[in-house]
């Protein structure tokens, strides 16, 4: 059985640590800083870091890769179309990678960056900075249409899928969601819960796709109350869901 834990890094990053207790081998996702991973390995003698999975090239996701690879000899997986330090295996859409005995499907999810990928295994999604709890990543390289398509692809996964994104942005994202849908009871309830969690220093991840579909405005671009709110701000138009997404993302950027 694989255990998944979070190693906090920087101010709001999580490095996901996958642990196979039967073999004492582990893997990490997006180690932007080597120190938390090294500290865990030092505290768990006998464990071997065998694999490093990377979703995209931003420094807060790859900054610790080369140090960890040098120290452990771990195999580094990452998107083929981005410059990933120390990468051994270049991945593209629909590839499969075997980690700790689990097969992960690779999804190309451009938007935050053009080469961004996500890893999925039977109810587990490691999605980097594409889908957040109650939000989504900023568009540094891709277009709104690309990001909307990427989110739609992830939203089509089973609803009980656990969403392991890389940042603790849930509270601020829910405040925006409440502005978009002030009468959404699911958003209000989640905001109340997350507020208490953060006051007590409790992490809010992982999420589930079912919860995201109820409370994440970027997965609700076809909902009439969401389109009405966008029309209130931008004027009434016959908008496609991707255009609603673009308007929401632009609003969130200045929220």
Curated annotation (Swiss-Prot):
Pathway: Secondary metabolite metabolism; methylglyoxal degradation; (R)-lactate from methylglyoxal: step 2/2. Gene3D superfamilies: Ribonuclease Z/Hydroxyacylglutathione hydrolase-like. Its cofactor is Zn(2+). Zn(2+) 1 binds at residues 56, 58, 112, 129. GO terms for molecular function: hydroxyacylglutathione hydrolase activity; metal ion binding. Pfam families: HAGH_C, Lactamase_B. Keywords: Hydrolase, Metal-binding, Zinc. Binds 2 Zn(2+) ions per subunit. Zn(2+) 2 binds at residues 60-61, 129, 167. It catalyses: an S-(2-hydroxyacyl)glutathione + H2O = a 2-hydroxy carboxylate + glutathione + H(+). SMART domains: Lactamase_B. Its EC number is 3.1.2.6. It comes from the Bacteria. One of its GO terms (biological process) is methylglyoxal catabolic process to D-lactate via S-lactoyl-glutathione. InterPro entries: Clx_II_MBL, Glyoxalase_II_hydrolase, HAGH_C, Hydroxyacylglutathione_Hdrlase, Metallo-B-lactamas, RibonucZ/Hydroxyglut_hydro. SUPFAM superfamilies: Metallo-hydrolase/oxidoreductase (SSF56281). The keyword Manganese does not apply. Thiolesterase that catalyzes the hydrolysis of S-D-lactoyl-glutathione to form glutathione and D-lactic acid. Monomer. Belongs to the metallo-beta-lactamase superfamily. Glyoxalase II family. This is Hydroxyacylglutathione hydrolase. The gene is gloB.
């Amino acid at each position: 059985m694989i255990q998944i834990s979070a190693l906090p890094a920087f101010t709001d990053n999580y490095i996901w640590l996958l642990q196979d207790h039967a073999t004492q081998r582990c893997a990490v996702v997006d180690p932007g800083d080597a120190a938390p991973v090294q500290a865990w390995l030092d505290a768990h003698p006998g464990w071997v870091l065998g694999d490093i999975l990377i979703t995209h090239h931003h420094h807060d996701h790859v900054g610790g890769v080369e140090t960890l690879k040098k120290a452990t000899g771990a195999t580094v997986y990452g998107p083929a179309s981005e410059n990933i330090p120390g990468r051994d295996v270049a991945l593209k859409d629909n590839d499969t990678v075997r980690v700790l005995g689990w097969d992960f499907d690779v999804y190309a999810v451009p938007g935050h960056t053009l080469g961004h990928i996500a890893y999925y295994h039977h109810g587990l999604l490691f999605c980097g900075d594409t889908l957040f709890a109650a939000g989504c990543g900023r568009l540094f390289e891709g277009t709104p249409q690309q990001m909307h398509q990427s989110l739609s692809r992830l939203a089509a996964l089973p609803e009980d899928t656990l969403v392991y994104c890389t940042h603790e942005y849930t509270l601020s994202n829910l405040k925006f969601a409440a502005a978009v849908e002030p009468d959404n009871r699911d958003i209000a309830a989640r905001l109340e819960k997350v507020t208490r969690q953060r006051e007590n220093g409790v992490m809010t991840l992982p999420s589930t796709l079912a919860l995201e579909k109820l409370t994440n405005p970027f997965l609700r671009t076809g909902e009439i109350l969401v389109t009405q709110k966008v029309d209130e701000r931008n004027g009434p138009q016959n908008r496609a869901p991707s255009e609603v997404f673009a308007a929401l993302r632009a609003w969130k950027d200045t929220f």
